[in-house]
Amino acid sequence: MGYHKKDCTPNRKKRYAQGDHEYGCYPDDHYDIHKEKKISRTVADFSYFNQAGSVVLTSTSTDPSVEEIIGLVKFKEVFNGDLISLGGSSTVTVGNISPKAITFRIHKVTTPQYNPLLSPTIYVHTVSVNANMTFSVPLEFVDVFIDDEAEVNYYYTVSIPTGVEATATVSSSTHTGNLYR
């Protein structure tokens, strides 16, 4: 009758330590199973800010592009492999002098900056518009992390292009975010 060697493969390395004897591994008494990353995804907490009221975009034919922040979703402690699902919608009312298009963006900020609009853009959605129209714009995006971050902020913005004389009002904006770990 022989002994069966216990499995010490890398995925079990934390739970078991290599023994000094020929029979394999023994349980590691200092290992906390509750700290082990779970395979199933769960929703984590997040902080949410939505711009109060409405945003009015107004430009002249000599102005550069006008971009305004309409929402912010913030997460603390994001880890490798985490999945973030962002969503939301905004109602847009275009004035009688309209831009040809309105662009919605999501900017991702992992380190605090003075101007979040200078951070990388991870989502762009452009909508063609006509004068005196009202419509709703849905926003959906999924982000997967490959590095750990102490904090990540997602800024939702809306803009009209350069060199256009236009007015538009963005209201009833709702933005949500779910982090799955």
Could you say what each language-model-derived stretch is?
Residues 2-181:
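Extracellular jelly-roll beta-sandwich "head" domains, especially the C-terminal globular C1q domain
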